[in-house]
UniProtKB/Swiss-Prot annotation:
NCBIfam families: glycerol_kin (TIGR01311), PRK00047.1 (NF000756). It comes from the Bacteria. GO terms for molecular function: ATP binding; glycerol kinase activity. Glycerol binds at R83, E84, Y135, D244, Q245. InterPro entries: ATPase_NBD (IPR043129), Carb_kinase_FGGY (IPR000577), Carb_kinase_FGGY_CS (IPR018483), FGGY_C (IPR018485), FGGY_N (IPR018484), Glycerol_kin (IPR005999). Belongs to the FGGY kinase family. It comes from Paraburkholderia phytofirmans (strain DSM 17436 / LMG 22146 / PsJN) (Burkholderia phytofirmans). GO terms for biological process: glycerol catabolic process; glycerol metabolic process; glycerol-3-phosphate metabolic process. The keyword Nucleotide-binding applies. Pfam families: FGGY_C, FGGY_N. Key enzyme in the regulation of glycerol uptake and metabolism. Catalyzes the phosphorylation of glycerol to yield sn-glycerol 3-phosphate. This is Glycerol kinase. ADP binds at T13, R17, T266, G309, G410, N414.
Length: 499
């Protein structure tokens, strides 16, 4: 197997990507293609499932061709994907009966309120680890059944299949031969019992969703079956599946209980490995499955922040104080601190651990001496402060003191932000050499399943440090910063609560 590689497919919200990895975890080739975002009404977000498939199949073939290889050079394929996005298709024709309803879509918010009024919230959280929210797949499936003509009847006949994006890709790669998902994607549907590791009949009944629609749930690392499409001339084992944040946690080698990663993207996703036991959150975090390898289940706590790197886009597009995202570090570095200015970027409400949908963006501490540099500094600081709030909630829920924070995503390239994150956390922020941790995690899961890599210990030895940011800010200054942030958060909530 010396000349073989692992192909990772990373199907995201705005683009489909493919990457080839070698035995040392290095990227050999990559391909990417964006696809259309569909907004039929305010608050609705859809994708064309056929375009998801065609772009993903296209970049898979392109990545292999670019490397001068063919299918025989690929030892296995791993899939990672945007989570919760819901596709329902006809088993007989293989055609979707409606567009994919994307995780961001809010059309079922009123129905979620009805479920809460029926007293289901506590039961759903106890079984699935999730709150009732339109973010997750369950109410999206229900909407399709209720609003697409003939869907209920076809579902009763057993003709309809539901899947998250991973299931849809596997179905197409195997020409309808496999209807499967993995435990991580199942754990984001609001229908999967994370304790029994089975679809929950009580929740299916409450939501009036036929069990016959659902995929078989498998481990995150196992051989599901071979490809059967013309994308590759040879049959390649499909051998790893994980939702994007779960794959990133594994790609960061956060394999021990208490290890945490933060992905700094448009928003921020913080995930903590909690070992073999699910921890029920008392601090508005989500309990989820990190991954399953063999019979071993790892659980996780997750907190999502709505506005992370997006605050930099706002400085560029909304305020016009920078021309491109790369300028923010230079501008923010031109002052030694924010001079008492705090930005709470609640442009779409506050996410974990506050969960305040009515909160709006607020800027505090502004004086005549406030400059664009101070606002830029406050914007960067806000990403670190919000991450701190989630990490403190994780520590409170788990009883584990975080030893270090592993970082990835676009904004982790900003050294000023990473240093401030370490300063206010009081622990090191650690950036890996391979920034593509999501795709790498999918590759690792697939490679383990086919013996390309021996075990997790071998993978641990591959994790390479790019830079370690060590806390350097004096304790008194950290306290002053955090006191100011807490005042700003309280004021933002007060603004939201004032009619």
């Amino acid at each position: 197997m010396q000349d073989q590689y692992i192909l990772a497919l990373d199907q995201g919200t705005t683009s489909s990507r493919a990457m080839l990895f070698d035995r040392l975890g290095n990227i050999v080739s990559t391909a990417q293609k964006e696809f259309q975002q569909i907004y039929p009404r305010p608050g609705w977000v859809e994708h064309d499932p056929q375009e998801i498939w065609s772009t993903q199949a296209g970049v898979a073939a392109e990545a292999v061709t670019r490397a001068g290889m063919n299918g025989t050079s690929i030892a296995a394929i791993g899939i990672t994907n945007q989570r919760e996005t819901t596709i329902v298709w006809d088993r007989e024709t293989g055609h979707p009966i409606y567009n994919a309803i994307v995780w961001q879509d809010r059309r079922t918010a009123d129905f979620c309120d009805q479920l809460k009024e029926q007293g289901l919230e506590e039961k759903v959280r106890a079984k699935t680890g999730l709150p009732i929210d339109s973010y997750f797949s369950a109410t999206k499936i229900r909407w399709i059944l209720d609003n697409v003509e003939g869907a209920r009847e076809k579902a009763r006949q057993g003709r309809l299949a539901f899947g998250t994006v991973d299931s849809w890709l596997v179905w197409n790669f195997t020409k309808g031969g496999l209807h499967v998902t993995d435990v991580t994607n199942a754990s984001r549907t609001m229908l999967f019992n994370i304790h029994s590791l089975k679809w929950d009949d009580e929740l299916l009944e409450a939501l009036d969703i036929p069990r016959s629609m659902l995929p078989e749930v498998r481990a995150s690392s196992e051989v599901y079956g071979p490809t059967k499409t013309t994308v590759f001339a040879s049959k390649i084992p499909l051998a790893g599946i994980a939702g994007d944040q779960h794959a990133a946690l594994f790609g960061q080698m956060c394999t021990e209980s208490g290890m945490v990663k933060n992905t700094y993207g448009t928003g921020c996703f913080l995930v903590m490995n909690t070992g073999d036991k699910p921890i029920e959150s008392k601090n508005n975090l989500v309990t989820t499955i990190a991954w399953q390898i063999g019979d071993q289940i790892n659980y996780a706590l997750e907190g999502s922040i709505f506005i992370g790197g997006a605050v930099v886009q706002w400085l560029r597009d909304g305020l016009g104080i920078i021309k491109n995202a790369a300028e923010i570090e230079t501008l923010a570095r031109s002052v030694s601190h924010s001079d008492g200015v705090y930005l709470v970027p609640a442009f779409a409400g506050l996410g974990a651990p506050h969960w305040n949908a009515r909160a709006r963006g607020t800027l505090f501490g502004v004086t005549r001496g406030t400059s664009s540099a101070h606002i830029a500094r406050a914007a960067l600081d806000s990403i670190a402060y919000q991450s701190l709030d989630v990490l403190k909630a994780m520590e409170a829920d788990s009883g584990i003191r975080i030893g270090e924070l592993r970082v990835d995503g676009g904004a982790c390239a900003n050294n000023l932000l990473m240093q401030f994150q370490a300063d206010i956390l009081g622990v090191d922020a650690v950036r890996p050499k391979v920034a593509e941790t999501t795709a790498l995690g999918a590759a690792y899961l697939a490679g383990l399943a086919v013996g390309y890599w021996k075990d997790v210990d071998e993978l641990q030895s591959q994790w390479k440090l790019d830079r370690r940011f060590t806390p350097a800010l004096p304790h008194a200054e950290v306290k002053q910063c955090l006191d100011g942030w807490q005042r700003a958060i309280r004021a933002a909530k007060a603004w939201a609560d004032t009619p």
